[in-house]
Amino acid sequence: MKNTDSVLRLITVLAFGFVLVGCETAPPTIQSGPDAELSFDGLHMVDNSQADVAWARPDFNLDGYTKIWPVGAGVEYRQAKNKGRTTMDRSKGGPYFIDDKARGQFEELVGEIFKEELQKVEKYELVDAPGPDVLMIRGGLLNVTSMVPPDPIGGRSAVFLSSIGDATLVLELRDSETGTILARSVDRRAAETIGGTFQRSNSVTNSSEVKRLIRYWATRLREGLDGFAQETASN
């Protein structure tokens, strides 16, 4: 494999693992041989990716790509029926139903933040169509869950939360012309308060936690792309 160290570092970052500077951790490796664990579409498991799950082609290589094309794969929400409209419903706790208005606001926020971060990528040109040197970055959110009840009943009750919800981000790298998948990562994270402490739930604090989570994912992606391109150019 060409530029193996750089490639595996990119997979690790794209899999949204933590960059552990100064810590002794095993490097990520793509399983190979007859005993390699394969995904449903033939990708090889990446060991030590420091993410929930990551796979890649055994010949994974991004040489030749100079542009990136982000493509949304949609958002799927957890099937929660509790709308928290009564005291009894509230006593059951979350997850809570996410209405169309909240879904629209969430999806708009995700799109804005990822677009903002990808526009900062220095080593790849951002495009909106396939091409011979275009890498498709396909991302989708699954099982989006909300632990936030609707507005307080009677406007009096206070709600304190340490986590307002969570979601799973699935990221795929594909060749834009053929659709061939090169790598996939799956990462589930919670939108939590700093330090996991309880704080009063309101629209301002809840929005802040959601933005922090989305920004975390988007920034890791941007840094991974720029870091890989820089290392490839120096080799």
Report residues per predicted region.
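Extracytoplasmic/secreted envelope proteins and their assembly/folding machinery
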Residues: 107, 111-115, 141, 211-218, ...
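N-terminal segment of the mature soluble domain
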Residues: 63-136
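Soluble non-cytosolic domains of exported or imported proteins
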Residues: 97-109, 161-162, 204-215
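Bacterial N-terminal signal peptides that target proteins for export
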Residues: 2-11
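Surface-exposed short loop/turn segments
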Residues: 116, 120-180, 192-201
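C-terminal motif of bacterial Sec signal peptides marking the signal peptidase cleavage site
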Residues: 19-22
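C-terminal/domain-edge helix-coil "capping" segments
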Residues: 24-56, 166, 177-182, 191-235
